[in-house]
Amino acid sequence: MWLCPLALTLTLMAASGAACEVKDICVGSPGIPGTPGSHGLPGRDGRDGVKGDPGPPGPMGPPGDMPCFPGNDGLPGAPGIPGECGEKGEPGERGPPGLPAHLDEELQATLHDFRHQILQTRGALSLQESILAIGGKVFSTNGQSATFDAIQEACARAGGHIAVPRSPEENEAIASFVKKYNTYAYVGLTEGPSPGDFRYSDGTPVNYTNWYPGEPAGRGTEQCVEMYTDGRWNDRNCLYNRLTICEF
């Protein structure tokens, strides 16, 4: 039975003109493809490829649980542009009541006394010779002699006026200068329109006198008053030079 395929094969070979020798391999035309075989086993992993480009940023993650420490203060910025004026505010609350008026008056009186004392001291020191304070007055002399009018001018320049006693204590204070310099001194009295009527420089009548017995005796010819070394008074011509004594 196997002789039939062999005879068929020989017949095909003879028809195609192919020579066949017993000792050589005959090459025929390709046969019909067979059915695909089953998949083989997976191969081994290949080598790492080249590093790719960075991908886009991912979405922001949730806040962390650990707080961060604040950083250092930055440099001060440049001054900003002045802003517009704001609206007028509401009136403030009423302040506490001020001091009573009488306290202010007392303060003014105290300041006036201080000012007066300063002027007294400044004027007395300007004479720079002898100073004596009696009550609210300061008597001072520069030790120089002059006429009545010249003494008035000198005392006025120093901020005072020619000394005039208005009490026994003040008379004794002026007399102490007269005794010290052993000379007479004018006091601030002048004769009025009537002979023997002596008054203060402001024109008011004299309320204290210490005349030497029999004085005043000039009867209108001696219109000033001088003090002796014992403190007694005598009317005298105003052109004589007498010790300069001022009061402040």
Swiss-Prot record:
Carbohydrate attachment residues: N207
Record keyword rRNA-binding present: no
Ranges for domain Collagen-like: 31-100
GO biological process, one term: respiratory gaseous exchange by respiratory system
Protein keywords: Calcium, Collagen, Disulfide bond, Extracellular matrix, Gaseous exchange, Glycoprotein, Lectin, Metal-binding, Secreted, Signal, Surface film
Disulfide pattern: C155-C246, C224-C238
Biased amino acid composition, Pro residues: 54-65
GO molecular function annotations of the record: carbohydrate binding; metal ion binding
Leader sequence segment: 1-20
UniProt cross-references to InterPro entries, sorted A to Z: C-type_lectin-like, C-type_lectin-like/link_sf, C-type_lectin_CS, CLec_Tetranectin-domain, Collectin_CTLD, CTDL_fold
Basic and acidic residues bias: start-end ranges: 42-51
Domain C-type lectin intervals: 134-247
Annotated positions binding Ca(2+): E215, A217, N234, D235
GO annotation, cellular component aspect: collagen trimer; extracellular space; multivesicular body
Subcellular compartments: Secreted; Secreted, Extracellular space, Extracellular matrix; Secreted, Extracellular space, Surface film
Region (Disordered): 33-100
Role description: In presence of calcium ions, it binds to surfactant phospholipids and contributes to lower the surface tension at the air-liquid interface in the alveoli of the mammalian lung and is essential for normal respiration. Enhances the expression of MYO18A/SP-R210 on alveolar macrophages.
Family recorded in the similarity comment: Belongs to the SFTPA family.
PANTHER family xref list: C-TYPE LECTIN DOMAIN FAMILY 11 MEMBER A, TETRANECTIN-RELATED
Subunit structure: Oligomeric complex of 6 set of homotrimers.
This protein's name: Pulmonary surfactant-associated protein A
Organism the protein comes from: Macaca mulatta (Rhesus macaque)
Lineage: Eukaryota, Metazoa, Chordata, Craniata, Vertebrata
